[in-house]
């Protein structure tokens, strides 16, 4: 077991009840184009077209053969584009239950499938896009082979669902998914679970079960990769979440694309925080109807630390998100807030009274309590960064755009979510995720 000592479990109110409840029916689903780093779509459908679940909606021009498929059957009602015609979302009004059929395999035949057969089925179904590379967090190129594959079977994000019961309820499909993944690599398939996890005993020798304990970010793929299979420009690994591993198993066992997902609804503004079963890409306007407290709220697809704001063309469940978080918009101004004791405020630096209430859950809002200022190295980043890097120097180089120094300091191992806690504790109010993405893009382009 690998024990993480540095990090932070954010004490936010609205922890979901770890029991799956019925969810409001959703009438629309969507694929969000901006979730896929560097993707340029070649559209295969237009507004008004009727599509089946699993039918191709568009292909990546930069990576031919990578297809993005419909998560439900229905009619394409809108194709939203932003500045410079960047694809924002492809929206489908759900109608019927028609689905594309794929090849089924017996469970005992999966371990002998050729690599090309596995790749072609994943590509045709759209489940290939569940895989992400590290470094760069992009969809893998068809035909490439990773040094290892990581399946994340734990989640330490604030307000997240507990993965173990969900996996155990679909254990046969999960094990089948792991077997399929072993056909894509000559290395290990690492299953990362929390301390005391009940997963283990897979027949494939390539599957390795690892346990991590400690505060967030102990449950992030970047943490697992750093300690088990560090990457470089010449070494690439892939990762995916546990529900996508289940979906891969179901695809090969049943011959149908399963887009159901169990997600956590949580946050201070959710009336009844709980787990619900819904559809990949579900409309959050439909899903949250009648679920929120009064007032101006911010709906976040994903974690409050690293998720994306869900509004307008983006008001749908993200492809890689297993939770929806809702907090209050913090627009009010506080007179002389800096001299108040701050019983209702949480601080990692012990500057507010709320720091001393260890079991208290706080009603966080979007208020950052100030604007951008100088980046002051007071040890905050080191408190929440468990990786073997120099965070203060790395973050400085990211802001300066110094790609050579940032690469030497380990930025290739990171994704935006790995720096989310650094953004949260930053006294200068900087957003380090976009700075990291800019530097990674520069490194990739320069080779």
From Swiss-Prot:
Q: Name one GO biological process term.
A: sodium ion transport
List, in alphabetical order, the Gene Ontology terms for molecular function in this entry: oxidoreductase activity, acting on NAD(P)H, quinone or similar compound as acceptor
List the keywords (alphabetical).
Answer: Ion transport, NAD, Sodium, Sodium transport, Translocase, Transport, Ubiquinone
| Enzyme Commission number(s) | 7.2.1.1
InterPro entries named in the record? NqrA, NQRA_2nd, NqrA_C_domain, NQRA_N
Q: What's the catalysed reaction?
A: a ubiquinone + n Na(+)(in) + NADH + H(+) = a ubiquinol + n Na(+)(out) + NAD(+)
For this protein, the record's Pfam families field holds: NQRA_2nd, NQRA_N, NQRA_SLBB
Establish whether keyword Cell membrane is in the entry: no
**Which protein family is named in the record?**
Belongs to the NqrA family.
Q: Which HAMAP family match?
A: NqrA
**What's this protein's function?**
NQR complex catalyzes the reduction of ubiquinone-1 to ubiquinol by two successive reactions, coupled with the transport of Na(+) ions from the cytoplasm to the periplasm. NqrA to NqrE are probably involved in the second step, the conversion of ubisemiquinone to ubiquinol.
Provide the assembly information.
Composed of six subunits; NqrA, NqrB, NqrC, NqrD, NqrE and NqrF.
Q: What is this protein called?
A: Na(+)-translocating NADH-quinone reductase subunit A
As recorded in Swiss-Prot or TrEMBL, the protein's gene is named: nqrA
